[in-house]
């Protein structure tokens, strides 16, 4: 398979993330359904986190086994530090980015107020400003999810490119199909937590490019450069970023909907992600 063909198929695999994004424009959903979708998003991300950390841990364990068999202990130490450091970097980077995205001026005061006024007005602030702040927070969280998924998808693109370059055409094709299915569910993961906030088409396109575009970029890099340390670095950073987002989704969903609904959604999302992975394994068998 040529580099151009591999890159084109990698782009298709990444573009399937757009299949789930239009759900964010649907407004005729009850609060309970929206909270369930947010929990479903957390479940999908939880599976991705499990999948990513498993792949990264396998690389580190193989380096350890190699060192025990007379290989380099330095390689193992480098891999271990990269794994731990990448995890921390991914989580802390998104925490910093969230603060930067939500940096805002104090809410403007509102004169007057009455018993019948909205809670925000009774507290002396402009309800419109409160609503705008909530909208910005929801869109920021959705974009953070897209960023975390994008880092993860870059590592998936690397796997596609490496398999194609090494002549394993069947494996490369299977990876493309499997990752395309994964990306389709990840689109739901991005818009699920928006909670009634209707994003613009421009926002959805940007989120799709950030979340799915790295699959295309990773495919190009993987076809030209085969580097296990590079793959480990992106897996670790992706794991940290996704872990941060899961924490944000869990805290918000439990506060709004309660534990039972949230746990049901998380289990459903995890099983959905696992099902797509089983399809990938079966197709490659």
Residue ranges and their predicted role:
Residues 1-285:
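Intrinsically disordered, metal-sensing/regulatory segments
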